[in-house]
Structures are given as C-alpha cells and as structure tokens.
C-alpha cells in the first residue's frame, strides 16, 4: 500500500507505487478530532475510518487527536466535559488507553499522528507526550502497525512512482 520513511519527527516521506494509470491510492487526512470530548461524533468518525479501511487508504492525523482539557493545572477544565470512562486519578492514562483500543482496527492504516495545540499544552503543563504514548502503545498491541508520531509543524512529502517515473507533492501541517 505505502512505505513510510521518517527523516525526523517533523519530516516524513510516503512512497506510493502505482502499477498503472488507473491505480488509485487514497489518504484520509484528519485534524481536530478531540476524541475524548463528549462532542466528538465517534459514529461519524468510525464511518469515515471504516471507509478508509475499505479503500485501503493511509490515515494521517494532523493535530488534536485528543482534547484532554480536564487535567490538573489546565485553566480550561470543566468536569462537565469529562466522559465517565475518563473520570479517575490517572485521567491521561485512561484517555490514551481507551483511544488505543478504539483505534486498533485502523492501526495498520495509520501513517502519522501529529500533536496539535491541545497536546502541546498538555506537554507544557503536565510533562506528558500523549501522541508519543498513543503511537507507541498502538505499535505494541498491533505488531504490523508502523504509525509515527509527527511534530507540531510537520512536512510530509508524498512520492508517487510508476514504471520508473516519479512525481511528488508536499503536505505541510501546523
């Protein structure tokens, strides 16, 4: 389907091989999912991700997979915005563990997950990298998963090759 080369945390290459001009390769590009927020439409998200599986599409998340505004020291917190399954003294662990289980069916299609302003705020206030923890745990439970944790400002170069010829395009996220 695709080969991923990680040049650094902020620079990745995706190599797509095409056998004919009729070949189609798809990428699902997502951002601002806020998975742990009660307002996240998980039903619609599942529908989109199931379609990506059906199409054998690569999946990239460009920031704010998590909301995670209910932790200690977060001035934005409001316990009314906390899902019951995340109500515990290990709030961040509960959020990431649930996310890993929920995303397992899509693990082999996940290419890249980048932090957004929510995850970088958590790193600043709580000294925990939710994206690195999520991608590491996903690779542990799904041996064929090759997802990378990207950077806040991220460059992804997509190379499309067919019969010795090659074309490319760049996706920048911030």
Residue positions per predicted region:
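Active-site-proximal beta-strand elements of phosphoester/diester hydrolases
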Residues: 25-35, 167-174
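Short acidic-hydrophobic surface loop/beta-edge motif
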Residues: 12-18, 153-163
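Generic beta-strand structural signal
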Residues: 109-111, 152-154, 167-169
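Core catalytic region of metal-dependent phosphoesterases/phosphodiesterases
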Residues: 15-25, 35-148
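Active-site-proximal loop/helix segment associated with metal-binding centers of metalloenzymes
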Residues: 135, 140, 162-164, 173
């Amino acid at each position: 389907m695709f080969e991923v080369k990680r040049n650094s945390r902020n620079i990745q290459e995706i190599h797509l091989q095409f056998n004919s001009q009729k070949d189609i390769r798809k990428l699902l590009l997502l951002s601002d999912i806020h998975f742990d927020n009660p307002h996240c439409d998980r039903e619609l998200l599942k529908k989109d991700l199931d379609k990506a599986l059906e199409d054998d599409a690569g999946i990239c998340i460009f920031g704010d997979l998590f909301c995670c505004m209910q932790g200690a020291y977060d001035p934005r917190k409001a316990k009314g915005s906390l899902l019951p399954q995340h109500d515990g003294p290990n709030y961040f662990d509960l959020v990431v563990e649930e996310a890993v289980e929920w995303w397992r069916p899509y693990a082999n299609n996940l290419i890249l997950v980048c932090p957004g302003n929510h995850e970088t705020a958590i790193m600043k206030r709580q000294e925990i990298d939710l994206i690195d923890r999520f991608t590491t745990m996903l690779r542990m439970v799904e041996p064929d998963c090759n997802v990378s944790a990207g950077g806040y400002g991220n460059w992804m170069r997509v190379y499309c090759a067919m019969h010795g010829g090659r074309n490319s395009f760049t996706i920048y996220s911030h």
